[in-house]
Amino acid sequence: MLKGKTVVLGVTGSIAAYKIANLASMLVKQHADVNVIMTHNATNFINPITFETLTGNKCLVDTFDRNFEFNVEHVALAKRADIFMVAPASANVIGKMANGIADDMLTTTILAAKCPKLVSPAMNTNMYENRIVQDNIKKLEHYGFEMIKPAEGYLACGDTGAGKMPEPQTLFNYIMRTIACEKDLAGKNVLITAGATQEKIDPVRFITNHSTGKMGRAIAENCMLRGAHVTLVNASVSVEPPMFVDVVNVTSAADMADVVKSKAAEQDIIIMTAAVADFCPSHPADEKIKKNDSSYESVIELERTEDILSYLGAHKANGQLICGFSMETQNMLENSKAKLAKKNADMIVANNLKVAGAGFGTDTNVVTLITADDCTELEIMDKSCVAAKIMDRLLKM
């Protein structure tokens, strides 16, 4: 997703500097051109050769390196950069950046850069909370820098509090959100449902299905990367939600219906990936049903749950897009086309549970995108790629 993108990582003197090697590796795996600039103090914590080995690029430390091919490298790299992240960012370098001091390769390059700039402070809690440091952070925010709030925990100095640099995965997510995709959903509100609802039989047992929420999560992440404000309504799921999305947790079909209906009017796009129960017990027991309890029959009486997709289709706002999912074991196209018309949806994503690589719990999917105009059959691919294809098709409607 980062092919053709130039990422500059500025590493300062902090014990957390070693973690940036992992971040650099993650970015390279996404085909980014990763360039690392280190302060001299940072080289006391991690060797520049580590970054050169991981990225395939020379690690820059000295502004006046006579052995390097660029005469004015700080300007050349600043022009090429698609994003500049300083992590870990010491109080010293934060102060320099906030006040326009350019006395080394890192501060000189970032002063010349016009790309998005992210800063991840890492220092002792008392240093981080010092009013001077906080003033410098506010000044950088005023100048358009995005500050990544440090985590709290046990610090290398022995103190406990704010000042820990977030884990590389978190920093990676910030970079991905900023430059991974064209922001063709900027300003749009997107609601996505995911996972399996649970319908209570008694306090111990419930009716559910095999949905894990992986497809819904993938779509939520894709929409977030494309600039949308995303609300993810999660039933029972086996995956963590992506960063930068609003998550609402629900249990039953009725819970999900209440949340979706309350938020539907403000959404530009609604995508119903959740496997919502069609039936629920009419009279769930307040106490656990015992096998030898003669007061309970062996038959559980069921009633239909509300059809959320039908409600959305009936109350669809002008310009709003509604996308449903169809899991079939036979007559997939016929049943899914009928569902599209009956529910007044704009698109149905259909998949056949019996096809290898499709369905619940897998990291891949095999789907057909069905609209009133056409059917597009996709080959087996990772669910993140399926998510991108779904959104590409919706945005053409």
Label every PLM stretch briefly:
Residues 1-118, 124-213, 217-397:
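A cross-family phosphate/adenosyl-ligand binding-site feature
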